[in-house]
């Protein structure tokens, strides 16, 4: 409903510079994620671009029941540009459709994947940022 402007909350602004990816999760579930990279980095040409200084995993707010990985594009793009870091927002599963602890498991699985694979991808060390649930 929020994406259609049918709630008191305005529809999110989705920026064209974000890249949608999925990360593996336990079982057969794939975690939808969205990332912003500093303008000095392009994954397609890693050899000639400047590697990110690190990676921020963004855990969006919403009390495990609202919002998604595309809800804060403007803020995440700002973080990427100001810090020189890659910023990945995790689209964890939401209650009540997917009751607790499914959302928490998605966040844990995304973090584990980024810790185990981020350096190999040239993304640097992992830190966490977020609002409400992500604090």
Residue ranges, per PLM feature:
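A glycine/proline-hinged amphipathic helix-loop "lid/cap" segment
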Residues: 1-41, 46
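Intrinsically disordered, low-complexity domain-flanking/linker segments in eukaryotic proteins
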Residues: 40-52, 122-126
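Short strand-loop-helix active-site module centered on a catalytic nucleophile
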Residues: 33, 57, 79, 90-91, ...
């Amino acid at each position: 409903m929020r994406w259609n402007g049918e709630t008191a909350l305005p529809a999110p602004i989705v920026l064209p510079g974000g890249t949608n990816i999925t990360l593996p999760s336990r079982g057969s579930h794939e975690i939808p994620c969205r990332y912003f990279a500093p303008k000095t980095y392009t994954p397609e040409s890693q050899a000639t671009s400047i590697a990110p200084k690190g990676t921020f995993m963004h855990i969006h707010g919403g009390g495990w029941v609202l919002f998604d990985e595309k809800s804060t594009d403007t803020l995440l793009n700002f973080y990427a540009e100001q810090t020189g870091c890659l910023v990945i927002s995790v689209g964890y599963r939401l209650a009540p459709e997917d009751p607790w602890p499914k959302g928490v498991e998605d966040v844990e699985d995304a973090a584990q994947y980024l810790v185990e694979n981020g350096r190999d991808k040239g993304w640097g060390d992992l830190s966490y940022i977020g609002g409400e649930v992500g604090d």
